[in-house]
Regions:
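Short loop/turn segments that flank or connect secondary-structure elements
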Residues: 1-126
Length: 126
């Protein structure tokens, strides 16, 4: 209640507040106990024209801007995401594939295609 829906983290980035050490303030659960974003849910159900911010859609990938117009992408390892990471391993679904929609929305189809090519080359050469 005291910090509001967002705060500035240790990296100086504005981030969404967390409730009880695990849930984003916009978290809701469906009838099966699956964690959902209430903003995205309202948009998908036609109840809001507001689209979830790309920074939220990309999570656990965090974007960082560098001098010279460079954009870095970092994977934010956090224990609350452990069940999703494990499920991804079981399904053989890496984070960048799971986030295809948001990554394409942010960087474009050509960029995402190149990402997949580079990832495949790394897998083949390791």
């Amino acid at each position: 209640d005291k910090q509001g829906v967002a705060y500035t983290d240790r990296d100086g980035e504005l981030v969404t507040s967390i409730v009880n050490g695990k849930d984003c303030v916009f978290t809701c659960y469906d009838g099966n106990g699956c964690c959902l974003c209430s903003l995205e849910r309202a948009h998908r159900n036609g109840k809001s024209s507001f689209v979830k911010p790309i920074s939220c859609a990309l999570y656990p990938i965090r974007e960082k801007q560098f001098p010279g117009g460079l954009t870095g992408l970092n994977y934010d390892r956090w224990s609350v995401c452990k069940p999703a990471v494990e499920k991804g391993r079981q399904l053989g679904l890496p984070v960048y594939r799971f986030l295809q929609g948001p990554l394409t929305r942010r960087f474009g189809e050509e960029w995402y295609r190149e990402l997949c090519e580079v990832a495949q080359a790394i897998v083949e050469n390791c």
